[in-house]
Structures are given as C-alpha cells and as structure tokens.
C-alpha cells in the first residue's frame, strides 16, 4: 500500500496544495510551526477521517473557508483507489472510488497508517483512555466490524448513562436490564477482539524488544480487562450501585494495558529510555501485525520523533520499516538522520510553502 498523491483544499494553513510522493521515503524538512506536521495530519485525516491532534473540527478548516477537503490516490496490489474526505458544518463525507460511504466504519481501513509522534510515549505512561484509544484505532483499521461494534457500544453506553441520571424513583429496572443486554452484546465482542489483538501484538513486540535491547530485556503486555466474569451478570449485580453513582461502572470503557520489562512496570519504574524503547517496539510490531491480519503494510508517519531517539534506535526504526512501508518523516534537520537510502524525496517547508528537492 502506497500513498501516491495527496491534495488539500482549505486544510489548516494550506489553501490549495497538491503533492506527489515517493513510494519509499518522504522527508519534510523545515523549522517549527511552518506546516510540516499539517501534512502528516492530513494523511491521518484521509485515513481515519479524524485528526490525531485535535477533536475540534473547526481547527482543521482554513480561517477563510467554510469547508475543507483532503483527497488522495492510494496504490494497492491490484488497483489505484481515489479517496476523499470532506468536512463542513454539516459533518463528514468520505468517498472511496468516487462513491460515498454511508458509514465511516466502511471507509476506514482503505488507507492503513501508523502514527509515531513524541506523544506516543503517553501510550506507556499516560492515561488508560490513551491506551483504549490506541486499541480502538488499530483494531478499527484491521477489522471493520470492530469499529462498528465500538460505535454501537458507545451509543448504548451513552444511552444507559443518560438513563442512570434519572431520579432513582423513576428508573425501571426491567428497562435498565434491556439496556444492559445491548451493552453486553457489543461489549463482549470488543473485549474478545482486544484480547486477541494484544496477544498477537505481544508476540511481535516481544521479539523486537529483545532485538533492540540485545536480549537484556523481556517485554510483557498485559490486557487488564475491567469485566472479570460475565458482563451481563456484572451489569445486573451493579445496577443499584450504578443508579447511585449515575454512571456505568463496569465494561470495556474502563479497560487498560500495562507494560512490563523483566516483570517491572515500565510506567511506574522504567526510565524514559525504556519507555521510548517499549513504544518503539510496539510501533514496529504493528507493521508486521497489520500485514499479517490484512495482507497490506501500513504507511508509517514519523512526526518529529527521530530527534527523540538515539542513533541506535533511529537505525532500528529505519531498517525495520524501509522495504516494507512507505514512510513519511517530519524533521527540523537532517543532522540526526543517519544512513538514509538514496531513493527518497525531500520536501522543504517554509511558512506553508512546500518545495520538492530535485532528485
């Protein structure tokens, strides 16, 4: 899978931009706040219909515009597929092969991506919500049905929580049980998919981590499932408690992940270097896992992370990804990028203007 071309209309600081990409490696070079990250954000938006930087859609539309559009050409094994995502006050419209997808869940996965940015360290040391979002994004690209179940679960959770905010005297437990059954139906599928995904991810990440640490460290990933027994029974047993708390206190919306090195919790006791290595191991593992599950390698987006890694980790990242994935890198300097291949494109970014260096 390769992204051959992208076109932006009123996206962030770009009024009208069209770029053709190298199938191997693309580097966006420039000082901070010039628009480098906006290009990777646009690719992320084209793939997932959402930004990785903001939840406020208005921020994505250029200040003088009322709507924006990101379109691209994705080269797959047997065809080149045009993709397009439009955003306006009316919402999102996603198209694949010029045909509108009625559900975003049917669109996501057309362009598979892996984003690696400095904030990815939050996967290890951040909040449980960050780790749940990680599972949801990656599983949504691999299995469209997971995204569907996740959306249905969140809708049912919202409905149950709204009902729990009623006065206790007005709550009908029979109706609450109906809501419980809807929640459990989709929640059980989510938990099964998450458990399977983490088990497979750990196999790949463990091997990579041992290579990165020369066999000195063993990585373990634990999926902490909030539901301990039967989801339906736990919801039923907690009805009185949930009515008192006015919220649903059990379910996959409270799941978490933990990372261990030699049986030591990395978030609590690991050094920053160890946390970075764990995050890197996971990202590299995802490359092979996505291929294993879908038959397609994802596109790798590296947003200002090379300066965060030492030369050894940089080399591991480049050697593992190149030859498998099309890679996009943003950076302020090439000084810390060692052993770059000759077949690449370099784009110079200055105040929203992009010039491609002659190859």
Curated annotation (Swiss-Prot):
Record flagged with keyword DNA damage: yes
Entry GO terms, CC: cytoplasm
InterPro entries reported for this sequence: DNA-binding_RecF (IPR001238), DNA-binding_RecF_CS (IPR018078), P-loop_NTPase (IPR027417), RecF/RecN/SMC_N (IPR003395), RecF_2 (IPR042174)
UniProt GO MF annotations: ATP binding; single-stranded DNA binding
Compartments reported by the entry: Cytoplasm
Signal sequence segment: none
Residues that coordinate or bind ATP: 30-37
A single BP term in Gene Ontology: DNA synthesis involved in DNA repair
Keywords: ATP-binding, Cytoplasm, DNA damage, DNA repair, DNA replication, DNA-binding, Nucleotide-binding, SOS response
Coiled-coil blocks: none
Its job: The RecF protein is involved in DNA metabolism; it is required for DNA replication and normal SOS inducibility. RecF binds preferentially to single-stranded, linear DNA. It also seems to bind ATP.
NCBIfam families the UniProt entry points to: recf (TIGR00611)
Family: Belongs to the RecF family.
UniProt-recorded name of the protein: DNA replication and repair protein RecF
Organism: Lactococcus lactis subsp. cremoris (strain MG1363)
């Amino acid at each position: 899978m390769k992204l051959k071309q992208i076109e932006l209309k009123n996206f962030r600081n770009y009024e009208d931009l069209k770029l053709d990409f190298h199938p191997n490696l693309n580097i966006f070079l420039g000082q901070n706040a010039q628009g480098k990250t906006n290009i990777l954000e646009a690719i992320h938006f084209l793939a997932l219909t959402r930004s990785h930087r903001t939840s406020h859609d208005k921020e994505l539309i250029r200040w003088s515009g009322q709507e924006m559009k990101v379109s691209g050409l994705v080269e797959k094994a047997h065809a080149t597929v045009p993709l397009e995502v439009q955003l306006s006050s009316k919402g999102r419209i996603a198209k694949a092969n010029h045909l509108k997808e009625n559900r975003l869940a049917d669109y996501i996965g057309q362009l598979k991506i892996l984003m690696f940015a400095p904030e990815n360290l939050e996967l290890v040391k951040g909040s449980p919500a960050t780790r749940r979002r990680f599972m949801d994004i990656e599983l949504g690209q691999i299995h469209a049905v997971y995204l569907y179940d996740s959306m249905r679960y969140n809708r049912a959770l919202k409905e149950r929580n709204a009902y729990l905010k009623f006065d206790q005297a007005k709550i009908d437990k029979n109706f609450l049980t109906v809501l419980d059954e809807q929640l459990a139906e989709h929640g059980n599928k989510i938990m099964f998919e998450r458990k399977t995904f983490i088990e497979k991810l750990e196999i790949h990440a463990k091997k990579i981590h041992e290579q990165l640490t020369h066999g000195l460290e063993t990585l373990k990933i634990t999926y902490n499932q909030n539901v301990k027994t039967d989801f339906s029974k736990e919801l039923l047993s907690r009805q009185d408690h949930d009515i008192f708390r006015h919220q649903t206190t059990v379910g996959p919306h409270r799941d978490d992940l933990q990372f261990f090195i030699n049986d030591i919790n990395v978030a609590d006791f690991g050094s920053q270097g160890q946390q970075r290595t764990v995050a890197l191991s996971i990202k590299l593992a995802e490359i092979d896992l996505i291929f294993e599950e879908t038959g397609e390698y994802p596109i790798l987006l590296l947003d200002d992370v090379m300066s965060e890694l030492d030369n050894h980790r940089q080399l591991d990242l480049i050697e593992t990804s190149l030859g498998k994935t099309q890679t996009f890198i943003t950076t302020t300097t090439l000084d810390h990028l060692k052993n770059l291949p000759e077949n690449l494109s370099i784009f110079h970014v200055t105040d929203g203007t992009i010039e491609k260096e002659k190859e």
